[in-house]
């Protein structure tokens, strides 16, 4: 197969905007075939071995069908680390990195190693690939982190990621809508639950609809806050007094979510925007 960088990205322009198509091809050539940016722009792709050229052709066929490049490569970069992903688990987004950064910046305080404080107990509801739980475990060493998800497939991937990255996270199979009260309490509960309304499907890219798990993305139009309500209600007993709850949210419902949290007795509710200026995150505290 003789091809050029230009020929490769043109195969994807019916699915992606031009710049995104170029970025996807660069990602493949760098990650899978070890080409540098200079190699790509000087069309060293034309010098691939017959075996590598065959592998590239198969990759391009998958990409041309709309399969996300993260699934094709089997990994995604999140907070500077490589997380394994596969069909059946949501691909982590850059916005969620900002959620992790907020938690870490607020709660990771210096301490004397000879007299460490009691570890913070953290729960991630809706673990997916484990990106939030693993990041918090690694970036906030004085923590005991648990995470739950309803998907056995996602938990297998999350556990593999934790082992490979050296994170101690207790993963459990649980339904976020049916979290039962226990004697265990947490200092932090964090969640990026499904929050896209069914009616918003028409605004989504087709390859997301075709390939990513809908149960990790969508909520019914008549109850868009169902996950926030369930987790917040659980937090009224599962959070320690003064413990904090962090959500990634649909920007359409920032006011409604804040009002719901206040009605449940939470205090100090704060909303933050993402890199696009959308109201994307909420932090609140159990009084």
Report each predicted region and the residues it spans.
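Residue-level signal for pocket-adjacent positions within structured domains
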Residues: 35, 43, 67-68, 73, ...
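SAM-dependent Rossmann-like transferase core, predominantly class I methyltransferases
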Residues: 44, 54-141, 145-157, 283
């Amino acid at each position: 197969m003789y091809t050029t960088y230009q020929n490769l990205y043109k195969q994807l322009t019916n699915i992606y905007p031009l710049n995104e198509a170029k970025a996807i091809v660069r990602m493949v050539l760098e990650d899978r075939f070890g080409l540098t940016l200079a190699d790509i722009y000087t069309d060293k792709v034309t010098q691939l071995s017959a075996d590598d050229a065959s592998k590239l052709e198969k990759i391009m066929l998958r990409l041309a069908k709309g399969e996300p490049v993260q699934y094709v490569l089997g990994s995604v970069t999140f907070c500077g680390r490589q997380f394994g992903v596969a069909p059946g688990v949501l691909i982590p987004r850059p916005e969620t990195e900002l959620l992790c950064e907020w938690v870490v910046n607020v709660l990771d305080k210096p301490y004397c190693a000879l007299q460490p404080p009691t570890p913070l107990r953290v729960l991630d509801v809706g673990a997916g690939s484990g990106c939030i739980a693993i990041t918090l475990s690694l970036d906030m060493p004085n923590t005991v982190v648990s995470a739950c998800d309803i998907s056995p497939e996602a938990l297998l991937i999350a556990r593999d990621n934790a082992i490979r990255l050296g994170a101690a996270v207790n993963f459990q199979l649980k339904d976020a809508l049916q979290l039962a009260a226990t004697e265990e309490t947490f200092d932090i509960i964090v969640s990026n639950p499904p929050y896209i309304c069914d009616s918003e499907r028409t605004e989504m890219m087709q390859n997301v609809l075709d390939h990513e798990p809908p149960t990790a993305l969508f909520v019914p139009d008549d109850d868009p806050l169902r996950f926030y309500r369930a987790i917040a209600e659980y937090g009224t007993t599962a959070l320690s007094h003064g413990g904090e709850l962090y959500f990634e949210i649909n920007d359409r419902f920032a006011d409604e979510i804040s009002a719901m949290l206040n009605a449940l007795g939470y205090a100090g509710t704060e909303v933050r925007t993402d890199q696009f200026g959308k109201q994307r995150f909420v932090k609140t505290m159990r009084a």
